[in-house]
Amino acid sequence: MLISTFFIAITHPTKYKLIMIFYFSCTGNTRWAAHKIAEATGDTLIDIAAELRKADEEDATDKKRTFSYTLSADESLAFCFPVHGWRPPLAVRDFIRRLRISKTTDNYCYAVCTAGDTVGEAMDIFEADLAAVDIKTDSCISLLMPESYVGLPFMDVDKAEAERRKKTEADRRLQDFIADIKCHKAGIHDITAGRWPRINSRLIGEAFTKWIIGDRPFRVDAETCIKCGKCAAVCPVGDISFMKGSTPQWKHNGKCLSCFACYHHCPTRAIEYGGR
């Protein structure tokens, strides 16, 4: 499974105690989860993809630019991320490496990952990235969501009934987790790692990162494309250029996550990938 989303709940340096949920969403699976949590907690949603793009627009050459936030003693820290090839996506890992949290105590921290299948050691990898910036999770969960990765011949979206079952079960488990995080419950590690978590994340995941993830196989059927620009608008890493009246073009800049947001959001199914 490759796709899903990212969020982090923290506060900007301000005199007000406003906790935010920073989310990263591609096809919408974890946007749904982030909104569910925000509805239950009253927290504010911030789009991490927009934050990353804004940083690039200001100075794309500054790869050492940090994202700094301040936490008060009574505020929580939370993360939710997509699983790409049994790993956290590259954009999320880049953000975490550049994240700086100013805190005076060990604030309560939880993490959520979403995937269409098992997650392998994705959470372990993510927690190691957090540890490198002095953050430790107290509880974590993985949610099984509708499949969105279609990049290989044997992988496809779920049938309608399977999708319905996944959504129902994910909603039930998320509601239970929300009740736990509201009271800062620690020690929850409800992760569907799968049968071969290390092989999937370390070996196959490395192969995905090196040889499969990328924008080269994407193309547009010019006759079907209505030139609406939706694909460029939904790309979380800004890898698609679009000018009114023209067909979209991929930038081949190494940022593509193979999240298939463009593929799934195209209203006329004009975007193709490989033989699909």
Segments predicted by a language model, with ranges:
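FMN-binding flavodoxin-like domain, especially the glycine-rich phosphate-binding loop
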Residues: 13-51, 68, 72-81, 85-207, ...
